[in-house]
Amino acid sequence: MKLNRYLDHTLLKPEATEQQIDQVVREALENHFYSVMVNPYWVKHVHAQLAGSDVATACVIGFPLGANTTAIKVAEAKQAIADGVDELDMVINIGELKGDHYDAVQQDIESVVTVGHTADKVVKVIIETALLTDGEIVKASEIVADAHADFVKTSTGFSTRGASVHDISLMKGAVQDRIGVKASGGIHTRDEALAMIDAGATRLGVSASMAIIGK
């Protein structure tokens, strides 16, 4: 297993400086991580350094609350694509999910998926498992698959907890092999990373990438 190719090397802290972003980019290039995941402001800067490499440029959309209007999420996605992004990790409208307004949740996702897929970009969808019941995790995962996104993702890393093996098992059970499953938030060691993969995760969002690969 090439564990490094499971990793989205992530720096989403609001106080992240250009110097810190550049360090993450260097680490990703040296270790061939799957992508560098940043906030939208940094996409153009990161893409300029990663273009032509085997490391993708990724960013978050509607982050971290997911409570933006769909139009704003779409505009943010379009800007990121113009700036050179390869993968978009959007946050669902969590309140609408918990309010059982499933059509609204799916339409919000589909709008970003359409923009992403039209430009041949990967779209991952964060459901924020920390705020959901088991039943809501399953339902949200099904909605994400029905919206034709590429991955369902556990967490922003900004809520009450990150991913758990239980979350991943529920999500994988819901989507089977229809779409990928991404675990993110609170994964700090190789053993934790492998446990997520064993449970069904096909991508990991981590800031502790260097520790996970033993560097």
Swiss-Prot record:
It catalyses: 2-deoxy-D-ribose 5-phosphate = D-glyceraldehyde 3-phosphate + acetaldehyde. The keyword Repressor does not apply. It comes from the Bacteria. GO terms for molecular function: deoxyribose-phosphate aldolase activity. The active site is at residues 89, 153, 182. Keywords: Cytoplasm, Lyase, Schiff base. GO terms for biological process: 2-deoxyribose 1-phosphate catabolic process; carbohydrate catabolic process; deoxyribonucleotide catabolic process. GO terms for cellular component: cytoplasm. Its EC number is 4.1.2.4. SMART domains: DeoC. The keyword Transmembrane helix does not apply. CDD domains: DeoC. Its main location: cytoplasm. It is found in: Cytoplasm. Pathway: Carbohydrate degradation; 2-deoxy-D-ribose 1-phosphate degradation; D-glyceraldehyde 3-phosphate and acetaldehyde from 2-deoxy-alpha-D-ribose 1-phosphate: step 2/2. Catalyzes a reversible aldol reaction between acetaldehyde and D-glyceraldehyde 3-phosphate to generate 2-deoxy-D-ribose 5-phosphate. Belongs to the DeoC/FbaB aldolase family. DeoC type 1 subfamily. This is Deoxyribose-phosphate aldolase. The lineage of its organism: Bacteria, Bacillati, Bacillota, Bacilli, Lactobacillales.
